[in-house]
Structures are given as structure tokens and as C-alpha cells.
UniProtKB/Swiss-Prot annotation:
GO CC, one annotated term: vacuolar proton-transporting V-type ATPase, V1 domain
Protein name per its UniProtKB record: Probable V-type proton ATPase subunit H 2
Superkingdom, taxonomy of origin: Eukaryota
Pfam families xrefs: V-ATPase_H_C (PF11698), V-ATPase_H_N (PF03224)
Keyword Chaperone attached: no
MF terms (GO), sorted A to Z: proton-transporting ATPase activity, rotational mechanism
Physiological role: Subunit of the V1 complex of vacuolar(H+)-ATPase (V-ATPase), a multisubunit enzyme composed of a peripheral complex (V1) that hydrolyzes ATP and a membrane integral complex (V0) that translocates protons. V-ATPase is responsible for acidifying and maintaining the pH of intracellular compartments and in some cell types, is targeted to the plasma membrane, where it is responsible for acidifying the extracellular environment. Subunit H is essential for V-ATPase activity, but not for the assembly of the complex.
Keywords of this entry: Hydrogen ion transport, Ion transport, Transport
Keyword Transcription regulation: no
Gene giving rise to this polypeptide: vha-15
Subunit-structure text: V-ATPase is a heteromultimeric enzyme made up of two complexes: the ATP-hydrolytic V1 complex and the proton translocation V0 complex. The V1 complex consists of three catalytic AB heterodimers that form a heterohexamer, three peripheral stalks each consisting of EG heterodimers, one central rotor including subunits D and F, and the regulatory subunits C and H. The proton translocation complex V0 consists of the proton transport subunit a, a ring of proteolipid subunits c9c'', rotary subunit d, subunits e and f, and the accessory subunits vah-19/Ac45 and vah-20/PRR.
Family stated for the protein in its record: Belongs to the V-ATPase H subunit family.
Taxonomy of the source species: Eukaryota, Metazoa, Ecdysozoa, Nematoda, Chromadorea
């Protein structure tokens, strides 16, 4: 298993990162519920009362360990936590119990086994007791419970799996999607950091489109601490070779590259470079590795590496990463063909007016290559026409579909077969005038047979438009 190894990159910081959850938890620790009143009113059982008060009154870790050991045989600790969390009506007191529970696990990771053992004796999983709490209305309760679930899933030897794991990742993804309204985003990110350090959980996260959710969150407006936490989660994913192999097609490299080109925080730069090193070193297939490297080059990573190389760092890991990436990326651009560059750009989904798009020589020599891998490039261009909302991407994709049809005899048939003609025609009514213009040119190329006449006609139209603008 590809667990996260020792590295100078900081581990999950559960104590020092200031978050709303931690600030509220600190207040709760100073406001113990009146358990005596609950007991006298028969709202909690005597066993629960005895355990919770004994644990609260313990003054040291040693004393708390003694309380837990004395109640281990009958699983009282697990029973009491479950009973108080699910049966106490007052949210304020449930918040307190959850904070106590979280502190209990944070103080000693091995304590999670008490809860797994108790659940096993009842022939159930610990998750079945607590996943339902994630549907509560109180946001603190929900997020503190999420933090506890992550610890139960990571600190011990029992791993979450199946529908329980799917449900939990689905919850975390929804929390990430609500980044503008979620005041506990740092807690969500920390849960992901913990979970994705374990290889058993990575594939399920990727298979459930978790990477797309991460990329969207990274592309949004996030503060520095949250940005670092999310990139940490990506870094954990890249330790898995299968996931690293998919990185070029998942949008990970572009998202990290954009941040790298703008970030001045060494902490962020360090972990992005470490992620890039993982991607290039975990992939064996030459073509995939080269595509990943080209995407990094397109994100101006080489320029960042040059600036970093001029500085002196005390961190040997960072120096090694800079050296490795510089060598790999420099090698990738050596003898780079124009089609390699174009292919990488299309695969990234981030089209722009790079020189190849307007090069007659490029289209004459490479149009037939669009048919490789079952018309992969054609399919990607059509998908961009159907799904992108970026006017620049729509303009370039329309142009390229038209040029493919113009230079490949059977291009019209291929484009129509994959609904490309319909996709282009829908853009004739786009709001952006440039999109409408390039869509119109593409439609004309799809319909006209006399390319020489069309070329002269288009030149004439452009000249007329230019005169009109003047």
C-alpha cells in the first residue's frame, strides 16, 4: 500500500490551525452539562452517568486511561457516547459530548479500538451508530461528528468500506461544494487530509468524482490555510500510481499549476512541487508521463523552478524536487513536435490561440492524426463545444473542428457521427459575438465543398468587416 511516507511537508495539523470548530469547542469544554439533573430526572441511565462523570473528573491521561480500562469489558465508554449523542435532546449538551469524544480520540489514537471492539461485540460497525448524525441541523454537531468519524476510520486498524465509505465521501463532497456557505470548510478539508493518507480510501474517492470536487474547490476563492489543506489532499492522492496516471485527464495538474504560478507561499509551492514529483515518478507509461510533463510546462512550472533554483533552501527534499522536475520538464520539451503541444493542450481542455491553431502547415500535416485512438481529439473538441462556458475555448474548438473538416476528406462524416455538427450549430445563437462568428465559419466548412472558393470568400468577409469597424 502506498501510505504517505516521511517527508518534510507538515502532517495533518489537528491542533494548531485555527478554525471555527476549534474555537467553539474550546468554549464548550468550559461548560459541562449538569449530568446529575439528567440522572435524577431519569433522562440518562445510571451506567452512563457513572462513566461520564468519572471520565470528566479524571485529572490526567493516566487517570482517564484507568477509567476507560475499568469500563472496557462491558464496552461502557462506547455505549455512553452513543447514548448521550443520540438520546440527549439539547443540542448544546450534544456538542459538549462530541467535543469530549473528539478530545478522547485525539489524546490517544489507540482508543478508537475501544469503540470498534464494542461495535463488533454487537455484530455491527461503529459507523452505523454515527453516520446518521451527519444529517442533523446543527452545523457544529455535524462537523464535529465528521471529524470523529474520520478519526475512527483512520486511527485504528479497522477501515471503513462499502456503502458506509461511499456515504461519508458523498457527505464530504457536498460540504466542499458549499464552500461559500460552509463555515467549517477547514474541518472538512482536515477530514479529507486524514482519509486520503490511507491508500484504501483513495480509489473510492476518485471513483466517486471526488477529484472533480477538489479541483472545483481549488479553482474557487479560498484562504491560504484552506488552499494548503486541499492541496495536501491532492498530494496524498498522488502516492497511488493508478491515480497519478489519471492526473493529466482529471484537471489536477492545471489546478495546481495555476496556483503555483501565482503563489508566494513557500509552504504551498513546496507541496505542489512534491505532488508533481509524485505524478512523474509514479507513472511508467512514456506517453502519459510526457503528457503530464507538458501540462506542467504549459502552466509555466519551468519558470517557477528557475526562480526557486536561484534561491538557497535548507530543505534537501525541496532541492531534490526542484532538480528532479527541472530535468524531467526540460527533457519533455526537447524535440517537442507541434502536434504533441497541440494534443496536450486539447487534453487539458484549456484551449487558447496558440500558434498551431492558425498554422496552415500544422493542419496539412496533422489533421489525419485527429483520427488516432478512435477519434479522441475530435471527441474532446466536441465535448468542449457541448460543455464549456468559456467563450475563448468555444471559439478555438469551433475553429479547430472546421479546420479538421477542411483538411481531412472524411472529416464531415466523423464530426456528424459524434454530433459535432449539432454542437457547432447551437453556438450560432450564443451570446458572445466571437463565438457566433467562429461557429458560423465552422458550419460553412461543414457544408461547403469548394474550399478554395470558401477561403477567398472568408478573406473578403474579414476585409469587409475590418473596413466597417474602421
Amino acid at each position: 500500500m502506498a501510505e504517505v511516507p516521511h517527508h518534510n511537508i507538515p502532517a495533518v495539523d489537528m491542533l494548531n490551525a485555527t478554525s471555527r470548530l476549534q474555537l467553539e469547542a474550546q468554549e464548550l469544554r468550559n461548560n459541562k452539562p449538569n449530568w446529575g439533573s439528567y440522572f435524577r430526572s431519569q433522562m440518562i441511565q445510571e451506567d452512563d452517568y457513572n462513566f461520564i462523570t468519572s471520565f470528566e473528573n479524571a485529572k490526567s491521561k493516566e487517570e482517564r486511561d484507568q477509567v476507560l480500562a475499568a469500563n472496557n469489558a462491558n464496552g461502557q465508554a462506547a455505549k455512553t457516547m452513543a447514548n448521550l449523542i443520540t438520546q440527549v435532546a439539547k443540542d448544546q449538551n450534544v456538542r459538549y459530548v462530541l467535543t469530549l469524544f473528539d478530545d478522547m480520540l485525539q489524546e490517544d489514537k489507540s482508543r478508537v479500538e475501544l469503540f470498534h471492539s464494542a461495535a463488533a461485540r454487537q455484530k455491527r460497525t461503529v459507523w452505523s451508530q454515527y453516520l446518521g448524525i451527519l444529517q442533523r441541523q446543527d452545523n457544529f454537531i455535524v462537523n464535529q461528528m465528521s471529524s470523529i468519524i474520520a478519526k475512527l476510520a483512520c486511527f485504528g486498524t479497522t477501515r471503513m468500506e462499502g456503502q458506509d465509505l461511499q456515504y461519508y465521501f458523498s457527505f464530504l463532497k457536498e460540504q466542499l461544494k458549499n464552500s461559500t456557505t460552509n463555515d467549517y470548510m477547514n474541518t472538512t478539508a482536515r477530514c479529507l487530509q486524514m482519509m486520503l493518507r490511507h491508500d484504501e480510501y483513495r480509489h473510492e474517492f476518485v471513483d466517486s468524482d471526488g477529484v472533480q470536487t477538489l479541483v472545483t474547490a481549488l479553482n474557487g476563492k479560498t484562504n491560504f490555510q484552506l488552499q494548503y489543506q486541499l492541496i495536501f489532499a491532492v498530494w496524498c492522492l498522488t502516492f497511488n500510481a493508478d491515480i497519478a496516471r489519471k492526473a493529466p485527464s482529471l484537471g489536477l495538474i492545471q489546478a495546481l499549476g495555476d496556483i503555483l504560478s501565482e503563489s508566494t507561499k513557500e509552504k504551498v509551492i513546496r507541496i505542489i512541487l512534491a505532488s508533481f514529483v509524485n505524478i512523474l515518478s509514479k507513472v511508467d507509461e512514456r506517453e502519459v508521463k510526457r503528457e503530464a510533463a507538458l501540462q506542467m510546462v504549459q502552466c509555466k512550472t519551468l519558470k517557477t523552478l528557475e526562480l526557486m533554483d536561484a534561491k538557497k533552501y535548507d530543505d534537501p527534499d525541496l532541492e531534490d524536487d526542484v532538480k528532479f522536475l527541472t530535468e524531467e520538464l526540460t527533457l519533455s520539451v526537447h524535440d517537442l513536435s507541434s502536434y504533441d503541444e497541440y494534443y496536450s493542450e486539447v487534453r487539458s481542455g484549456r484551449l487558447q490561440w496558440s500558434p498551431v491553431h492558425k498554422s496552415e502547415k500544422f493542419w496539412r500535416e496533422n489533421a489525419s492524426k485527429f483520427n488516432d485512438k478512435q477519434f479522441e481529439v475530435v471527441k474532446i473538441l466536441i465535448k468542449l463545444l457541448e460543455s464549456s462556458h468559456d467563450p475563448l475555448i468555444l471559439c478555438v474548438a469551433s475553429h479547430d473542428i472546421g479546420e479538421y473538416v477542411r483538411h481531412y476528406p472524411r472529416g464531415k462524416t466523423v464530426v456528424e457521427q459524434y454530433q459535432g455538427k449539432a454542437a457547432v450549430m447551437r453556438l450560432l445563437t450564443a451570446e458572445d459575438p466571437n463565438v457566433r462568428y467562429h461557429a458560423l465559419l465552422a458550419v460553412q466548412k461543414l457544408m461547403v465543398h469548394n474550399w478554395e472558393y470558401l477561403g477567398k470568400q472568408l478573406d473578403s468577409d474579414v476585409q469587409t468587416d475590418t473596413v466597417a469597424v474602421k
